[in-house]
Amino acid sequence: MVSIINYKSDNGMTAVIKSSHYSVMLYVKDKDGNIIIDNKPYSGVISAKNALRKLGGNWETIEE
């Protein structure tokens, strides 16, 4: 089973964290649609969320 969490920051960036039993991947776009992080693997969801914090801005989950 894959869990998908969508995020948006106050500076216009969007992100998706996809997690399964085997991996956690992070995908981030800036406000212009340019890819910043393209499916980079992380050891866990917390590590991926920490990577979002390092990009700056206030991140919140969004419903899709």
Predicted segments, located by residue:
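Short N-terminal "domain-start" leader segments
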Residues: 1-29
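Mixed-charge, Lys/Arg-enriched low-complexity segments
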Residues: 3, 32-64
